[in-house]
């Protein structure tokens, strides 16, 4: 990777710096999402003993552990809650820049890859929202980068670190088990081709210790997940998409902001073609160092899909939903590598045109405000401040709709409102001093002749 700094490289640096600033702004200013609030209320706020006594798929263990540390060290705020994800986002942006620079040089293709890997709305949200998906994606990408560096110049230390990163990605989000296992398996199989054209000299004698890397990967994930998973019940783990079709449809809708069936159908066909083409391209580049990115990512995409389908069929596990964010780099990287490696000008121009259309779509729906997962609760913080002002120091009993319950409990802790009685997750059959209602329970306002103190499209505060 040459140390030159061209216009495209400077543009990418300024763009990534601006994106980081937006991530920081959102982390500081946006209301907590239901997933963030649920995780805090069940697994971060309680004592370690209580938190470890139960587990569900919303508990992204590595993120939970780091958030416990950050909120204890800096006091509970939206920023301290999201600080681990924000730092993981910095890591992801750095890895994307480094990988794109190393494999795609500079120029339009370099900028296209950087944009496609960072501007997708799903990725933008993940880079600061207090969930484990962005963290898992960052560690998985770092593992891929370390493996690719070791392909070019063998380094056992980097391979060991890559195995640790893969384990951390699984600990950050369980859906990353499939791509983590797939990447490690593909690399270990690829490394058996040492000694072929393009492989660094000395690699034959320094083949990566497959069992050791697999053990490092397993132990890293095991240390963080063993105790929580020991308390898990299948009903709390078996939550997700019922088919790979549903997974692709949801990823496409969130990425492009449309639920058109024809777009989803095109995405499904394209993914299938990419997986098949990835296998063939991997075979062609299998033993060549300069084709390592295409070989590893193409084969990893195909094997990941195989693992998901096999696990669903024989282990009855669900398909991932938000956790399928790894499909973004697993499609962008091999496609770009294959097109640029082919040196076909027509294909390269077509790729840049399609990339421009996608990037324009991403920019048009850039999520500078509330996170998609909590868009209906964008006014939660304003509501909580209104409730705090109205309640004063009096002991108050608050009734909340089931969907709003974890959010109000979060703000009870956030603003240290000990005078608010803990909000229970129960139907609104009793009488309360204040009501926090979602549209499904809005009829209570008329039925009980309540006075509305605050209202937006997703939440209503009444007394």
Indicate residue ranges for each PLM-predicted region.
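Membrane-interfacial, low-structure loops and terminal tails that flank and connect transmembrane helices
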Residues: 1-5, 194-208
